[in-house]
Amino acid sequence: MWYDKEKLCKELWCMKRFFKSLLTSFLIGIPVAVGLIIFMYMSQRNVSDEYIEIHIPEKTIAKEEIIVQEEFPKELEINDNQIVLEETFSDTVNAPVSLSFAGDVHFSEQYIAGYEKSGVSAFADDEMLGLMRNADLFMLNHEFVFSVRGEAMEDKEYTLRNDPEYVKILQEFGTDVVGIANNHVLDFGQEAFLDTLDTLEAAEIAYVGGGHNIEEASAPVVRTINGQTFAIFAATRVSPSYDWYAGKSRPGIFQTYDATALNKALSTAEQTYDHTIVFVHWGIERNEMPEEYQRTLAKGYIDAGADLVVGCHPHVLQGFEYYNGVPIVYSLGNYLFGNRTGETLLLNAEFSSDGDLKIQLIPCERINGVLTRIQEPKELFEKLTNLSFGVAISENGILVP
């Protein structure tokens, strides 16, 4: 066979050079690859160590309870203490607790029409909605019926109800608890009252001050927030009929014309929970000064163990008082109640980790139908100071006994 000897030599030389280069690359590549693997491993260890150092500070290590979390790296072991990541848990032991309270609420036809057009912004602006939603617990006076059944009570000037579908408004407010011990929640009879309980329960909104029987109506709503326990009671000193009172097997509301039962419950709760609160329906409509019986009842609640007393019903704001170091809020007025909402308040009660209580008033009013924070509240605070009993109000709304 004929072939070009010179060409063959060149091809053999090229193949020799190729295999030599391949062998050199292989010998050099092994240590490079090993070094790269070691580098990646050490980097990963550093990342894990940094994660533990940054995200598990000593302040988040609580005692007593153990919680195992799947999010932790495998190398982290949980031993005797509970480890809580702030990014993972809403409850933070030793953080203050913010409870917000609003007064009388009923959704008028005008409000409903606005809601259908503009959503929840028809009720309150973004700032007020944020304050309601961001509280650890938000509670209001639910002064109407959720039902389409029943007949309006005869000889009653105002009977109030809404279609159950509008419970979504309360949800959009961020409502956690509603007080139903008042003079409107049975306006359409027991069937409609039971519909109200069912509607609230389905919406996962707790109710207090009423129920299927006296045992439920007189029981508090209990919450544990940031390591502190709260028992919230509700009762009414205003009722159109004795038939509205809950009985052993009768649905209804918890009354405090005779405060014996409530005071006994408060005394028991005081020994079980860190804080006890009374949300009470009382007073005379449109009277800016509390009745003497309101002051007497409030002091009795405090003697029995209450740490805060909050009142509703007069549809106007009333003043404040401290008794044995415990604040009494005589009336929060209308919050969102038809067209009758004037100047009103969102009350913020902040409990520190050591149990101290600070009360701050968030003044608000309706502007073009929308609840809006009052930016210059000095005049309102001066008025409320004059209505109060030995209580001052700072420029930022803090009650000063």
Predicted regions and their residues:
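Acidic, metal/ion-coordinating pockets
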Residues: 25-401
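Positively charged n-region of N-terminal signal peptides that target proteins for export
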Residues: 15-20
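Short, Lys/Arg-enriched N-terminal segments with co-localized hydrophobic residues
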Residues: 1-14
